[in-house]
Amino acid sequence: ACYSAAREITEKFAKICAEILERPDKLLTYASPENLRKTNIQLDSYSSERQRLFFNEAPAMLLPDSVMDELIHGTENRSYQEYLRKLKRVFQKYTCKAHVDLILYSSVISDYIMTGELSLGNVAHQMEPEQVKAHINYLARCLEENENFRLFVLKDTSNMRTNFPKPPSIFIDTNAVTIENSQRKPNENYHISMYPQMIEMFANYFDDIKQKPNCVELTAEELRRYL
């Protein structure tokens, strides 16, 4: 359960609840991974000019072309192949040039480099060490080439991660907010809202995370040091 006595938060929720009671819209709608791929919601999000992305696991974004090609050739599922091809084009054409704020746990970066575990389109992949290295280096290159692409790292400790529940991943663009709880079953973990006040509320929450004392911005060179 979550609660807040902060006046700013309660007033914001009061406005949302009042509007919802007047018209029976859902604040958050369940979305299956299959529907997300079919309706291009994830592709639209990565194509957005403004993105706020908080991953609680390895970042499923901006993989270099060579790695994407290997993943495409490594699956026999035609619909997933087509999804990966579209995702590759979106990364090439839009995501690398967009205004992106990306937040990751420091331990998540380290774990990804050690284990190579990556979920892409809700499909688990076991990445090779060279693929992980290429991915991290490409993210660093995007940081260098796009001044509007910024990476923030939450300096977490093993004690913090064990004593507190892992928050869901949050993806915010200009049109929607998507929440992914990777601790739940794959067919239960996506919820989406296109409700403007929900998008604004989560955007404010995201921006608040960036102000936390344990949240620091990383340069491209600092990211490469994880390797």
PLM ranges: what are they?
Residues 216-227:
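Charged phosphate-binding loop/patch that engages nucleotide di/tri-phosphates or the phosphate backbone
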